[in-house]
Amino acid sequence: MELTGKHVVIVGGSSGIGLETAVLVRQAGADVTILARRADRLKQAAKIIGGEVRAEPLDMQDEAAVANWFSRFDAIDHLVVTASTALHGKFEEVPLDQVEALFKSKFLGPYRLVRAALPKMREGGSIVLFSGALSRRPSPNAAALSSINAAVEALTRALAKELAGRVRVNCISPGMTRTPAYDGIPEPTRSAMYENAARTLPVGRVAEPREIAEGVMLLLSNAFMTGSILDIDGGRSVS
């Protein structure tokens, strides 16, 4: 894939899927900008990516900061929003403020980023959002996450129609992936979680971040794809 001369902005690019995407995009010759909340992780990520990479802290829930950041650039070709969070618990027990926080992070955050980026995006560019396998195959104790993932997919399809002729809009729906997002879960609980998920999948394991990042590269490069929800879930959607 050739991305020489293209400016790719990756939100959540300091770790996991976002970092692996940044590595692949840089190898393809793109000018890379990674954004995330923690400056220390950004600094380390920039070393891993190598070459010329812009790494700047940004909280996508801060509307003024997001607007100010995008106002500083002349042009963006591709926007990838991998930053996300999760929430699990019984429907009747999960505090509503946590549900609201999840909605603000996983839906309103990307929504805000796309609105701010659009005036700077070159015609023919693309946007890649992230949902999750729970959007169409919900599990118990994940009502909020399942619903919000579905909302991201609906947003993807709506924007693909509304922004047709300007930019393409697609979405990755990944299955469980071995990323730092789960580092807060203590061992052996984390390993058990991966093992339990693996047993339900035809491929017999959870994903590695690079495998999801390769799907992002497909969406960036295939000019005939828009409004697509790309399942990279190890077969969860058919299991």
Give residue spans per PLM region:
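C-terminal substrate-recognition "lid" of short-chain dehydrogenase/reductases
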Residues: R205-I232
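Conserved Rossmann-fold SDR core element
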Residues: E153, L163-T177, M225-I232
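Rossmann-fold cofactor-recognition segment
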Residues: I48-A64
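Catalytic loop of short-chain dehydrogenase/reductase
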Residues: L102-F103, F107, Y111-R112, S126-A164, ...
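Conserved NAD(P)H cofactor-binding loop of Rossmann-fold oxidoreductase domains
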Residues: T82-G89, G234-G235
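Catalytic Tyr-x(3-8)-Lys segment
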Residues: R190-E211
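Conserved glycine-rich cofactor-binding loop
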Residues: S14-G16
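Substrate-binding pocket helix/loop in short-chain dehydrogenase/reductase
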Residues: K90-F91, Q98-F103, M193, A197
